[in-house]
Amino acid sequence: MGDMMQNRLYAVAATFSVLPVVFVGLRLWARRVKRVKLGWDDFTIMFALVRSSSYLGSLNRARCLFNATVLRIAVSHKTDTAVGGLGKASKTNADGIPIYDNTYWTHMKVSFGNRLSQVLAIGPTKMSVLFFYRRIFGNSGRTIFDNASMVLMIICAAWTVAYFFGNLFHYMPIKMLWTVTADKLPAPNKQLYLTQCYIDIATDALIISLPIPITFDPDPDFQTYYLATITYWTLIEAGLGIIAACLPLLVPIVRKMSWVLTPRSGQDDIPLNPKNPSPPS
């Protein structure tokens, strides 16, 4: 059973070390195809990608090899699975008492790093989507939408900062996590974790539903309406969130490839930026 679980963890590490990088790369290629300048939605998703790599990268003790690269995702996750005992039952002696060895301390360091990096991966992903919404629908006279999206951005930024430092200073001194055995650690603050999750889920739901009223506008701009329909991806947590945030921007690449097989029509190219449309590339 332990080997099966570890194999699954290896598969997860391999998958999410590649897919987010590929989709962010395609996103940037789409920007180049459409000759659209990078915006804050692009910068925040790239930051989220780096932090997502650190989320699993914090599992890696071989930081000298992959300290600043997204390749840390797979290598680090595999390192913790092999060295930190991830996916295996905790070691105990003949009396069932836990054994606190280097494997245990490695895992505790990993868990601490995960909590910090996860917040820094999820928060910027949320903000990237909100920046993308404002790129499409902003400056269009929709005061309610502008105000609502700005309030959500402030909430997401505050959530990121508050829970980063909340997790950072949960135990003081910090090194207590990997120097004190579990039976001597203070009880964790469940309210901290529960409120973090509740606000996380609530902001996800609000972000997903934010553009829906605009799509039911009785007289929408055609280009804006078309782009809105491809933004409803549940870009939630680190890896899948990054992929989902990039998907709406890959239309130019798909169309560019489809032109090889089908002739162009006069209306088959929808600009990514309705305020600054560019001719087909």
From Swiss-Prot:
Glycans are attached at N67, N147. One of its GO terms (cellular component) is membrane. It is a multi-pass membrane protein. The chain crosses the membrane at residues 9-29, 149-169, 196-216, 234-254. InterPro entries: Rhodopsin_dom_fungi, SAT4-like. Keywords: Glycoprotein, Membrane, Transmembrane, Transmembrane helix. It is found in: Membrane. Belongs to the SAT4 family. PANTHER family: INTEGRAL MEMBRANE PROTEIN (PTHR33048:SF134), PTH11-LIKE INTEGRAL MEMBRANE PROTEIN (AFU_ORTHOLOGUE AFUA_5G11245) (PTHR33048). This is Phomoidride biosynthesis cluster protein H.
